Each structure stands twice: as structure tokens, then as C-alpha cells.
Amino acid sequence: MRIWSRAADLAAQTPAERNRYVDFLRAVSIMIVVVGHWLIATAYYQDGALTPGHLLKSEPGTQWLTWIFQVMPIFFIVGGYSNAVSLESAARKGERYATWLAGRLNRLVAPLLILLLAWSGIALVMHLLGTRPGVIQFTSKAALIPTWFLAIYIMLVILAPAAYRAWRRYGFASLGAFVALAVLTDIAFFAADLRWLGWSNYFWVWLAVHQLGFAWRDGRVGSPALLLVFSAAVRIMSP
């Protein structure tokens, strides 16, 4: 019961103006990402050995579920909203960029380091117990792959002040610019065979979705449902 008591205390200390719906969406999206990645990482015994597998490959009928559990846009929209709130607060306090960035990154990186250290210990124990390297590699990937989006999000946090200034000055045109860059990247990738350029779409697409968080903060998109429609449109236009 202590955890619920602690949660109640934290809720009581939360400022009235804080958007709790944003906190709810962040928690739900992260939980779905983690659980979803764990569920698709399947393993089975073959010839007496544990063999790594992938649910979407071994059971193709489950692939349609990925359309239902597309929650990453929600996470990045919420990230944009939260970064806007944080940047506004920093501006009121006269906080420098380095101080602001250190605070934001500490909240992201500290828990990740704890996870990495804990899993390193688990992997070491598995090795000492004679577990096959392939199994250690598979379980490590299954345990840590849900953190992939943090690498992208950390880059967005670093770029957030510049992206927010672009939003304040150009509004939805800034979002359109990122979508256009994503489309041009795809054209270069498929038409000109510039494969190395394809990786940049991790930034352009999610920067565009992140801008929607700024729009939400400014009340420019109306209801959250409309926000998700915008997000879906961005994802479709920039595959």
C-alpha cells in the first residue's frame, strides 16, 4: 500500500495547472511500447535448444495489431507539449539553455543508466551460469529494445528550443517544413538510391509530430482526437 500512498502524496503536490491528461498519455504510451516489444520477442525450443523468434514473423496473422498499437506519435506529441511547458517556465526564470537541457536530460538518462547497469549484471550472471551467447543476446535485445525511441527523443530535446522558436515564428509552416523534408528524404532514398540518407527521417518525421505538441500547447488543434488525426496524417505523408 505504500506505493499508492506515495502516489497520492505526489498527486496532492502536483500544481493545479498541470495537465494530468498529458501525464496519463505519456504513461500509457510508454507502457504499451514496452509491453508490446516484449510480447513480440518470442522464443521456442528447437532441437533441444532455445531459439529466438519474432511473433510477427512466426504468426503473420498478428501483424494487423501493429496498426492498433501505434502509440509512438502520442509519446512524441506529449513530449512536444511538455517541452513547450518546460521552455516557457525556463524563459520566465531566465534559465540558460545548458541548465534547462541538463535538467531535461537528467530525467531521461538517469533511469536508463540504472536499467543498463541492472541488465549488465543479469547478463553477467547468465554468462557465468553457462547460458549460450545467442540466448544472452536475444534476451538482452528483448529487454532493451523498447528504449530505442529514447535516442530519438533525446535528440528532439536537444533541438527543442530551436524547434519551439520555429513554431512561435512560423506556426504550422514549421511542421510542414519537416514533413516536406521527410518526403524529400524518401524520394532520395527510393528514387536516387541514397540509402544512407534514409536514417534522417527518424528526425524529420518525429520532429513534425513533436511540433504537434507545440500546437496542442497553444490550443491550435482543438481536441486531442483531432490531434491524433493530424498525427496520423503526418505519419502517412512521411512513411
How should each PLM-predicted stretch be described?
Residues V34-W38, F178-A192, A232-P239:
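Aromatic-anchored segments of alpha-helical transmembrane domains
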Residues P60-I74, Q137-I152, A191-V209, S223-A225, ...:
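Interfacial loop-to-helix transition and helix-capping segments at the boundaries
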